[in-house]
């Protein structure tokens, strides 16, 4: 007999007031409001335990259930979780426009979080704001006639979010019979702050030559600080801190061109480009000034780690390397088995950053009478992708690489012999060296679930034909201005360039550090379709 009880409740409400007015050359818009959220969750489960400590196995027929009759000396027969949370917010925005030439706007938001009420001498609310301005320079200044529109813009904003509420007393296991909470495995969070992002953007939009050419350019600089992080403390306790400061800055460019020499033909092309530079400015420090070490293992004892180090970038990848002779620099090999030695547990070889700095896209639309043809090419330059699939195939000797190595050994009479002369196996040269090792031992050393990372980390640069479509419109098919458009389309057709043996866009999970990771992922799919669109 198991008794399980679950109850959850959620409530959300908001309100908004708006005011708009025009005074001669000025237009004013104001919005103000607030929101509130309440949620609660209560769950507990009881499993009867005999005095011996073992669960009951015989059938039980009960007509009365009393908590005090349950044997409570075992921690295995009960469990529970209780969470309560609330958030409150007030906000306001204002916008002032002068003669449709200059616009200035700003916003203010104040948030209250229940999570912060759990700490003494701390105000549970935090304020954020933003401000921006834009100017239509073609309406303010006399510009060359080739310039149809020129807009300048700039903005600054702050946004934030609470620390998780369910880390502390609001979320703990409890004994449903006594109501007592079981001590948490979390060490007190000292001086908590909300995660905050401060962003600045500036750019311009311009249209030229009867708006046939359009350009947009934006520069951005965003700093994330007080990031919520978890570290392992003494005796299995968990330490939670706000720490670190990360900067993202870059540019975004968009260009378009429209060529329409007559009413029967037009060509519209669009190009976009983005560059992002990420840098970890500071990392969290202990009270004695020592830096916290924050890293994410790509898998249990995988030998591949994402490390967050001051001066580095988010997504820096490190891996285990071979053990080398301190004098000659040669890879150390076991003389009896021929297996190269690895520096297990020491993921110190930097292999690059997993994130691409450059992304691009180019689309084209050709219209001729009632026909329309469209295609999109996109890609990215840089970044790394990891294939555990290739590592496991090598480990089990089922990859083309291992087959080629065995064939080369047989065709070239290349063999490895153990130090005592007892064992002889097909051999191979360790890539880049003159050292001969057994084919099987080499690939079972560098492959598998704990690989020598450099062998299975690939450049993620790629370009592909992302989408293509052909459409025809039957005009006035159902009457005046009642048309039917038939189109055939395909997505993700093929790569124009790729270096990795897998799709660089593959992702094992949405969790941190699990993007760009392949572990026997499903093959990349192409899609084909036909669509009908009727307009009346």
PLM regions with names:
Residues 113, 380-485:
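Extracytoplasmic gating/loop element in the C-terminal half of outer-membrane beta-barrel translocons
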Residues 351-388:
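Glycine-rich, aromatic-lined ligand/substrate-binding cores of catalytic
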């Amino acid at each position: 007999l198991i008794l399980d009880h679950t109850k959850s409740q959620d409530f959300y409400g908001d309100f908004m007031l708006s005011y708009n007015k025009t005074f001669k050359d000025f237009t004013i818009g104001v919005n103000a409001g607030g929101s509130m959220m309440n949620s609660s969750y209560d769950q507990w489960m009881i499993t009867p335990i005999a005095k011996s400590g073992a669960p009951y196995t015989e059938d039980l027929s009960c007509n009365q259930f009393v908590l005090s009759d349950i044997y409570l000396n075992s921690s295995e027969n009960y469990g529970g979780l209780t969470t309560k949370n609330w958030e409150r917010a007030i906000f306001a925005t204002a916008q002032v426009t002068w003669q449709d030439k200059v616009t200035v706007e700003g916003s203010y938001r104040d948030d209250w979080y229940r999570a912060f009420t759990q700490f003494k001498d701390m105000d549970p609310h935090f304020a954020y704001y933003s401000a921006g301005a834009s100017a239509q320079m073609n309406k303010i200044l006399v510009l060359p006639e080739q310039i149809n529109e020129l807009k300048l813009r700039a903005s600054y904003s702050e946004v934030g979010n609470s620390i998780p509420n369910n880390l502390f007393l609001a979320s703990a296991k409890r004994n449903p019979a006594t109501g007592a909470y079981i001590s948490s495995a979390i060490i007190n969070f000292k001086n908590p702050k909300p995660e905050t992002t401060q962003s600045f953007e500036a750019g311009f939009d311009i249209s030229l030559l009867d708006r046939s050419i359009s350009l947009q350019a934006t520069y951005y600089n965003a700093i994330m600080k007080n990031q919520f992080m978890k570290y392992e403390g003494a005796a299995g306790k968990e330490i939670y801190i706000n720490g670190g400061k990360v900067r993202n800055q870059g540019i975004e460019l968009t260009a378009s061109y429209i060529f329409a020499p007559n009413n029967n033909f037009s060509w519209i092309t669009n190009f976009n480009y983005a560059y992002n530079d990420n840098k970890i400015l500071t990392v969290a420090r202990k009270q004695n000034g020592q830096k916290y070490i924050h890293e994410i293992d790509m898998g249990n004892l995988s030998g591949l780690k994402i490390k967050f180090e001051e001066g580095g970038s988010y997504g820096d990848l490190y891996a285990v390397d071979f053990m080398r002779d301190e004098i000659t620099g040669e890879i150390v090999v076991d003389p009896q088995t021929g297996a190269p030695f690895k520096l297990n547990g020491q993921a110190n070889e930097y292999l690059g950053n997993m994130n691409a700095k450059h992304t691009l896209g180019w689309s084209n639309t050709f219209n001729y009478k009632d026909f329309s043809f469209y295609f999109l090419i996109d890609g990215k330059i840089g970044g790394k992708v990891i294939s555990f699939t290739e590592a496991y195939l090598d480990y089990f000797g089922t990859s083309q690489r291992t087959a080629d190595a065995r064939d080369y050994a047989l065709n070239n009479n290349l063999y490895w012999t153990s130090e005592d002369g007892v064992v002889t196996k097909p051999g191979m040269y360790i890539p880049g060296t003159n050292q001969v090792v057994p084919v099987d031992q080499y690939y079972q050393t560098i492959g598998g679930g704990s690989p020598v990372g450099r062998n299975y980390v690939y450049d993620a640069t790629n370009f592909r034909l992302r989408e293509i479509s052909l459409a025809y419109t039957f005009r006035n098919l159902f009457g005046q201005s009642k048309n039917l458009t038939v189109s055939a389309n395909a997505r993700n057709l093929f790569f124009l360039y790729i270096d990795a043996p897998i799709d660089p866009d593959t992702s094992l999970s949405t969790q941190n550090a699990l993007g760009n990771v392949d572990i026997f992922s499903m093959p990349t799919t192409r899609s084909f379709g036909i669509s009908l669109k009727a307009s009346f």
